[in-house]
Regions:
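Extended C-terminal subregions enriched in glycine
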Residues: 74, 97, 191, 224, ...
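Accessory "access/gating" subregions that flank catalytic or transport cores
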Residues: 1-47, 116-130, 138-139
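Short glycine-rich loop/turn motifs
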Residues: 30-32, 54, 133-138, 146, ...
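Active-site rim segments in enzyme catalytic domains, especially the processed small/beta chain
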Residues: 13-18, 146-210, 234, 238
Length: 313
């Protein structure tokens, strides 16, 4: 009945959905991608999502000694994220249409080669444009299972199209396609677009540590990287890792900084060639959640940038 309602509405409003589209669609169990980072195993969803950007950046950062409040550490993280996003936007698409396998991008040898590009100055490279988002993330656990879950209809109310009588707002993930000729993510029939939603999961010494995630469109992989660095490099607890001030790479090679990042760090980054500015809107820097299993206890943390909370019952 729901499928019929969708089809009738699509036909009445000039939509392109067909019965064959709905019949061909099915959820998929996928094998997550992972990398080892300084004692943690970091798990992310594979393409057609942007989880690979998190792992690419961490592979680059593995070769650096990162320290809290060290301006150089900010520079290195920003450059690693820019390189990771450049690869992600160029190669990630529906996995049936990708030119490179994720394993090739995530090889440690490739990371070592790319790491040499990170020097004493900001790289003169422009990233593709970002787009707005509308995403919800939650992490949950009990005595037996742990879940990292994310859902998004993309821009606010998605397409803005509500199917009468259903309460369902249709998403507009088709906006994630490219129109560039020859790009693996170019729009086409039966293809799935590049998308932003990436629930994460961490393990230590082969044992599950717990789910984590950061809502926020193209801030998601950047938030994941900064949370993992806080945990693995700086030894922070989950709440402190979420609380820590963040940066974000945005279009035009600009870097946004939260007000909590010291002025001296901003000046240092400017001297290295970064275009930085402070942004007071905390919602732009993602909203995260974490649940970890520590021994017999579960530890929850919630980002102060949103109205979420850690709740036990």
């Amino acid at each position: 009945a729901l499928a019929e309602a969708l089809l009738r509405f699509s036909e009445a409003t000039g939509g392109l959905l067909t019965r064959e589209d709905l019949e061909a669609h099915a959820p998929e169990w996928v094998t997550p991608l992972s990398t080892e980072y300084k004692g943690l195993t970091v798990w992310e969803l594979p393409p057609n999502g942007q989880g690979v950007a998190v792992l690419l950046a961490l592979n680059l950062l593995e070769g650096f000694d990162l320290r809290p409040e060290d301006p150089w550490s900010y520079h290195v993280q920003i450059e690693a994220m820019r390189l990771a996003l450049a690869d992600t936007y160029r190669f990630v698409a529906d996995p049936r249409h990708m030119e490179l396998a994720p394993a090739a991008l995530l090889s440690k040898a490739y990371a070592a080669e790319r790491r040499r590009l990170i020097g004493e100055r900001a790289l003169p490279r422009v990233l593709p444009g970002l787009r707005p988002e509308g995403t919800v993330y939650l992490a949950a656990a009990d005595g037996e299972v742990m879940v990292s879950l994310i859902q998004s209809n993309y821009q606010g109310f998605g397409s803005g199209v509500l199917v009468p009588g259903t309460g369902i707002a249709l998403q507009n993930r088709g906006l994630g396609f490219s129109l560039e000729e020859g790009h693996p993510n170019r729009v086409g029939p039966g293809k799935r677009p590049f998308h932003t939603i990436i629930p994460g999961f961490l393990a230590r010494e082969g044992k599950p540590l717990g789910p984590f995630g950061v809502m926020g469109g193209f801030m998601q992989p950047q938030g994941h990287v900064q949370v993992v660095v806080g945990l693995a490099d700086f030894g922070l607890n989950p709440q402190a890792a979420l609380d820590r001030p963040r940066w974000q790479v945005v279009p035009g090679d600009e870097v946004l900084l939260e007000p909590g990042i010291p002025q001296a760090t901003a000046l240092f980054l400017k001297d290295l060639g970064h275009r930085v500015r402070y942004e007071a809107e905390y919602g732009l820097f993602g909203r995260g959640q974490v649940v970890f299993r520590l021994g017999e206890a579960l530890v929850g943390a919630s980002d102060p940038r949103a109205e979420g909370l850690a709740l036990a019952w």
